Curated annotation (Swiss-Prot):
GO BP annotations, alphabetical order: siroheme biosynthetic process
Name this polypeptide is given: Sirohydrochlorin ferrochelatase
Binding site for Fe cation: 20, 86
Naturally occurring in which organism (per UniProt): Priestia megaterium (Bacillus megaterium)
InterPro entries xref list: CbiX-like, Sirohydro_Cobaltochel/CbiX
Upper lineage: Bacteria, Bacillati, Bacillota, Bacilli, Bacillales
Pfam families noted in UniProt: CbiX (PF01903)
Protein family per UniProt: Belongs to the CbiX family. SirB subfamily.
Catalytic activity of the protein: siroheme + 2 H(+) = sirohydrochlorin + Fe(2+)
Enzyme Commission number, as recorded: 4.99.1.4
């Protein structure tokens, strides 16, 4: 997809942020608000937001909006936590469809956030923000979106181990909202069977949406006098996340794209 350049070229740069999308309008609105705040950290003339599914503008519409403003190089940045099918296949396929109509445009493709200790620090903050005094006998149930890609389970387990150390918890277990096991009900059931007096349920999600509502519904009436279930907030906007995203964009635009081929997952 990338042209081999023999001399320096002056580009009109653009950034196209690809969010997942949500049936819940608030979730899509939060994604846009997050990007609007992140834009201020970057000196890039053209910055657009689009969605993979369930919301608009689409990837095609976002790409074309960049072209209409004169972009000659577009850094496409997936606003996703972990690398799974969306980042490896779905987004690249959509990019390829529209790129074929604009082969003169240089396209760079970025990475999801991945395993990052700075994000784990934010998770600790979200637990602390519950304003519940942490019992020495407590655990965390880290709830991921889920994927059939084994790399997602590997990465979430790594994040769980980092969280266990940083948050000084005796145990951090994982479960998933879809496409992987244990699922949410199973994860909660396993936590219920433990002797821990507190279970912090921590959604590993960027924004609210149907999945966040599902977690809330499952948590209703689980707490007892002997065991307390506490729902922490999703990641949402955080200056630390904005800094990570800005750094990713700057790195991408300085790379000339030769290691950011959308086919690298094939």
């Amino acid at each position: 997809m990338h042209k081999k350049l023999t001399k320096e070229v002056d580009y009109m740069d653009a950034v196209l942020y690809v969010c997942h999308g949500s049936r819940v309008k608030e979730g899509a609105d939060q994604a846009v608000a997050f990007i609007e705040r992140c834009k201020k950290n970057l000196d890039v003339p053209i910055q657009e937001v689009c969605f993979l599914e369930l919301a608009s503008p689409t990837i095609e519409q976002g790409f074309e909006a960049c072209i209409e403003q004169g972009a000659t190089r577009i850094a496409i940045v997936p606003l996703l936590l972990l690398t799974a099918a969306h980042a490896k296949h779905d987004i690249p396929e959509e990019i390829q469809k529209v790129y074929e109509r604009y082969p003169q445009v240089e396209v760079l493709y970025g990475e999801p956030f991945g395993v990052d200790e700075r994000i784990v620090d934010i998770l600790v903050e979200r637990i602390n923000e519950t304003n519940v005094d942490k019992h020495e006998d407590s655990m965390v149930l880290l709830v991921g979106r889920g994927s059939s890609d084994p790399a997602v389970k590997r990465d979430l387990n790594e994040i769980a181990q980092l969280l266990k150390g940083k948050g000084a918890f005796k145990e951090v277990s994982t479960c998933y909202l879809a496409a992987a096991s244990p699922n949410l009900k199973e994860g909660l059931h396993l936590a219920k069977r433990t002797s821990y007096k507190q279970v912090f349920v921590l959604p590993y999600l960027l924004f609210t949406g149907i999945l966040m509502n599902e977690i809330k519904e499952e948590l209703e009436q689980l707490s007892t006098d002997a065991q307390q279930f506490i729902l922490a907030n999703y990641l949402g906007y955080h200056d630390g996340l904005a800094h990570i995203l800005s750094h990713q964009v700057k790195t991408l635009l300085s790379s000339k794209g030769n290691q950011y081929d959308v086919y690298r997952y094939a």
